[in-house]
Amino acid sequence: MAKKRRRFTLKKVPLAAWLVIAFFAVGSMLVVSSYWSQRQSEVSQRQAIVDKKAAEKAKKKAFIKRLVPTAQTMQQQYGVLTSITLAQAILESDWGTSTLAKDYHNLFGIKGTDPATTKVLRTKEYVNDKWITVDGRFRVYSDDAASIRDHALLFVNGTDWNPQQYATVRAAKDYKTAASALQTDGYATDPDYPQKLIHLIEAWNLTQYDN
């Protein structure tokens, strides 16, 4: 008599078990999706930062390039190093973004006395070993080139009380000597002024424009 074959049947999985499995499956998918979404967000943020820095650097290079021709002409005519002119313009105008530079083309913070050709603005001065805010009367120019020319002529003609005040700046043959002379000759009150100029000149290789 032939034996009956035993049938193998799958045991029914309780509904609760299926729900648990589905819960963990969906949860895993959500975790993975969230991870990749976060990664994409981080990548996008990093790229945005890189793009912003690149745009800022491009603007700064464009600012330098725009001033170079006039600055080099002033060096040829009056002996003021182009690298010094560029570094001062960058530092004094914050890359051409200051109100004085944007609205009045005064790149160097040069002051004046004639109300018809000047504008009163708030400025910071280093007095008695501390920074203070004061009102200053600054010259207004028609364009940046006019500001650069006036800057060079200031070194040539000096001040009303001392025509030779900036003679050592013009006589300097290298940017470090010229930067130090600006401090000793009284151009700026900031005790760190020379070092700030030197840093800008070296960081942006501004000596390449000296002729």
Label each residue range with its predicted role:
Residues 1-91, 95-211:
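Catalytic cores of secreted/periplasmic lytic hydrolases that degrade extracellular macromolecules
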